[in-house]
Amino acid sequence: MTTIVSVRRKGHVVIGGDGQATLGNTVMKGNVRKVRRLYNDKVIAGFAGGTADAFTLFELFERKLEVHQGHLVKAAVELAKDWRTDRMLRRLEALLAVANESDSLIITGNGDVIQPENDLIAIGSGGPYAQSAARALLENTELGAREIVEKALGIAGDICIYTNQFHTIEELTSKAKDPENV
């Protein structure tokens, strides 16, 4: 249970997440780092789901990035294949949001690798709130990617009981894909 949101805008891609870890109905920790830099700081990734499961997936994904020389899409597809077919990995319950300078992806345990519309990702229990907020800000303001992520996480944290106001945010310079990103 968490909120991870990613926005790509005006030459930047940002992934941010809250820091709350819960066990049942109890907050166990409030400062978990659910967003990390991978592959020599060229990839940023965030997770929603079980913490131990997510750390396992981070390690596996980083290995795939090494094998595929940092090619994000290939590494994501290979991780998703393994995740879906390996008996032990299938039990892992988490979602990953990953991005590099040119691509943003969601990787699921069902074997899905999804490139979202408008390079907006929001996953976890607070994902729908963060996505709604980020989309409104993207469509109606000139705010930068980082500010949109900060505001979307704040709104999700105000609404979702499994999301707090401790945020970890990572940012990369992005390659432009459309006029909005120039």
Curated annotation (Swiss-Prot):
Catalytic reaction equation(s): ATP-dependent cleavage of peptide bonds with broad specificity
EC number: 3.4.25.2
Cellular compartments per GO CC: HslUV protease complex; proteasome core complex
Keyword match Protease: yes
Cell compartments where the protein resides: Cytoplasm
Sites where the protein binds Na(+): 157, 160, 163
Active site: 2
GO MF entries: metal ion binding; threonine-type endopeptidase activity
Role of this protein: Protease subunit of a proteasome-like degradation complex believed to be a general protein degrading machinery.
Subunit structure: A double ring-shaped homohexamer of HslV is capped on each side by a ring-shaped HslU homohexamer. The assembly of the HslU/HslV complex is dependent on binding of ATP.
NCBIfam families per the UniProt record, alphabetical: ATP_dep_HslV, PRK05456.1
Family per record: Belongs to the peptidase T1B family. HslV subfamily.
Protein known as: ATP-dependent protease subunit HslV
Organism, as annotated: Sodalis glossinidius (strain morsitans)
Gene responsible for this protein: hslV
